[in-house]
């Protein structure tokens, strides 16, 4: 009991220190980019969320857009088979909240940003909502949120779980201090055997662990619409043009690609730059200007009729807009401090996939893609040659598309396995 109390106080102190260290960056985003203004009352516990109706409640949580998006087939199936349940969906980012509202409010879900995990804030929210089940997407588990839910009698599950090598070392250190961070979880449904070994290394019993594959490979028919013609028309791309979509781009990705794009000046190759963070838009623009690349902004009505390069300065469209591409690159993979983003979205839109050398956030998936030749791993030296070959050789592009489709087909049963495991837990509960 004393150790648990001490751990909670130390954790609170760590969060407070982290807040003050991050405060300058946070306030910069508030005053110069208008971020967090709509969500601060919920984040700091000034305003408490309210869930309508009666009946059992399941609380889903994911860090941001990707983690909450993969919940879509799960919520749809849950609503079909257990309509008496109420849904709550939380996320840590404003972009994630916008995505969750678009996807889940029509299903009757209550969506809001997750309050800060300080014990004086999150515990009162958990007590008010009193969830019967809490489901964490991929690994964004928060200590007080998890432990307070368990104290009130909730079941807690991790789905599509993963644990990086860096995180494994960090949680192994906590284990040596006598704290198993993930111990309160009832079940861990993981993407891969490697992640299973890492969770076992930090003290999780194998009896709690199921390996089902990556849920992101599952495409619900209602979500699999390929809007290639729609987006190519909106972007004003002719049938002779070839489009490269550079998704989730960070400044270091832009630096590498700017050198390559300069070789396609005045050609039929069009480049769509999609920043990961809109607050870095000016930095992206300066890098393109420095490289002598003329570009337009989507928000200002620019199109490929006027420019060979466009910056897509709008949130929430990347996954859909991949469908317009002839080649796609996933950003964050030329930046060792980032380590990549969702590699599956281009494949789901039947587009050849490229990614850089830094992909440790999804290293297992990246290795699978390389083994199946469903994705191209490139570096600064090979990038221009690979892009040129794909642009000039339609057969090669089609071969990568087919290999991507085959890869997704082999992995698509992961959702069904995950659902069957969760369903068995739901039906056993006495609500």
Swiss-Prot record:
CMP binds at residues 275-276, 315-317, 342-345. GO terms for cellular component: plasma membrane. Pathway: Bacterial outer membrane biogenesis; LPS core biosynthesis. SUPFAM superfamilies: UDP-Glycosyltransferase/glycogen phosphorylase. Pfam families: Glycos_transf_N. Its EC number is 2.4.99.12, 2.4.99.13, 2.4.99.14. It comes from the Bacteria. It catalyses: lipid IVA (E. coli) + CMP-3-deoxy-beta-D-manno-octulosonate = alpha-Kdo-(2->6)-lipid IVA (E. coli) + CMP + H(+); alpha-Kdo-(2->6)-lipid IVA (E. coli) + CMP-3-deoxy-beta-D-manno-octulosonate = alpha-Kdo-(2->4)-alpha-Kdo-(2->6)-lipid IVA (E. coli) + CMP + H(+); alpha-Kdo-(2->4)-alpha-Kdo-(2->6)-lipid IVA (E. coli) + CMP-3-deoxy-beta-D-manno-octulosonate = alpha-Kdo-(2->8)-alpha-Kdo-(2->4)-alpha-Kdo-(2->6)-lipid IVA (E. coli) + CMP + H(+). The chain crosses the membrane at residues 5-27. GO terms for molecular function: Kdo transferase activity; transferase activity. It is found in: Cell inner membrane. Keywords: Cell inner membrane, Cell membrane, Lipopolysaccharide biosynthesis, Membrane, Signal-anchor, Transferase, Transmembrane, Transmembrane helix. Its main location: membrane. GO terms for biological process: lipid A biosynthetic process; lipopolysaccharide core region biosynthetic process. The record marks 138, 216 as: Transition state stabilizer. The active site is at residue 67. It is a single-pass membrane protein. Involved in lipopolysaccharide (LPS) biosynthesis. Catalyzes the transfer of three 3-deoxy-D-manno-octulosonate (Kdo) residues from CMP-Kdo to lipid IV(A), the tetraacyldisaccharide-1,4'-bisphosphate precursor of lipid A. Thus generates the genus-specific LPS epitope of Chlamydia, composed of the trisaccharide alpha-Kdo-(2->8)-alpha-Kdo-(2->4)-alpha-Kdo. NCBIfam families: PRK05749.1-5. Belongs to the glycosyltransferase group 1 family. Glycosyltransferase 30 subfamily. This is 3-deoxy-D-manno-octulosonic acid transferase.
């Amino acid at each position: 009991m004393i150790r648990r109390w001490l751990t909670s106080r130390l954790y609170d102190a760590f969060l407070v220190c982290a807040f003050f260290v991050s405060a300058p960056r946070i306030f910069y985003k508030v005053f110069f980019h208008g971020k967090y203004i709509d969500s601060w009352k919920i984040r700091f516990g000034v305003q408490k969320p309210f869930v309508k109706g009666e009946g059992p409640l399941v609380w889903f949580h994911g860090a941001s857009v990707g983690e909450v998006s993969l919940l879509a087939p799960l919520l749809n199936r849950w609503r079909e088979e257990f309509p008496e349940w109420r849904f709550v969906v939380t996320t840590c980012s404003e972009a994630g909240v916008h995505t969750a509202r678009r996807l889940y409010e029509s299903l009757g879900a209550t969506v809001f940003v997750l309050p800060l995990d300080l014990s004086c804030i999150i515990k009162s929210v958990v007590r008010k909502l009193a969830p019967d089940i809490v489901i964490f997407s991929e690994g964004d588990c928060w200590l007080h949120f998890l432990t307070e839910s368990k104290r009130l009698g909730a079941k807690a599950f991790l789905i599509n779980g993963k644990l990086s090598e860096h995180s494994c070392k960090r949680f192994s250190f906590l284990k040596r201090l006598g704290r198993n961070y993930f111990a309160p979880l009832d079940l861990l449904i993981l993407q891969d055997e490697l992640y299973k070994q890492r969770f076992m290394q930090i003290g999780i019993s194998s009896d709690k662990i199921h390996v089902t594959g990556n849920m992101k490979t599952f495409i619900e028919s209602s979500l699999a619409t390929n809007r290639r013609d729609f987006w190519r028309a909106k972007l004003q791309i002719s049938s002779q043009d070839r489009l490269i979509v550079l998704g989730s781009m960070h400044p270091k990705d832009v630096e590498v690609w700017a050198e390559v794009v300069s070789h396609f000046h005045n050609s039929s190759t069009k480049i769509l730059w999609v920043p990961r963070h809109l607050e870095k838009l000016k930095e992206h623009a300066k890098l393109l200007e420095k490289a002598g690349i003329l570009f337009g902004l989507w928000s200002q009505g620019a199109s490929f009729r006027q420019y060979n390069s466009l910056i897509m300065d709008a949130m929430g469209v990347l996954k859909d807009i991949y469908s317009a591409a002839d080649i796609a690159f996933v950003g964050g993979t030329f930046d060792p401090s980032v380590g990549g983003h969702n590699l599956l979205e281009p494949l789901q839109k039947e587009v050849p996939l490229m990614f850089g050398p830094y992909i440790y956030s999804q290293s297992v998936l990246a290795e699978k893609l390389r083994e199946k030749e469903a994705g191209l791993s490139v570096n600064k030296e090979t990038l221009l040659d690979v892009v040129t070959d794909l642009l000039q050789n339609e057969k090669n592009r089609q071969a990568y598309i087919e290999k991507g489709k085959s890869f997704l087909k082999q992995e698509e049963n992961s959702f069904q396995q995950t659902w069957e495991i969760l369903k068995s837990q739901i039906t056993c509960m006495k609500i």
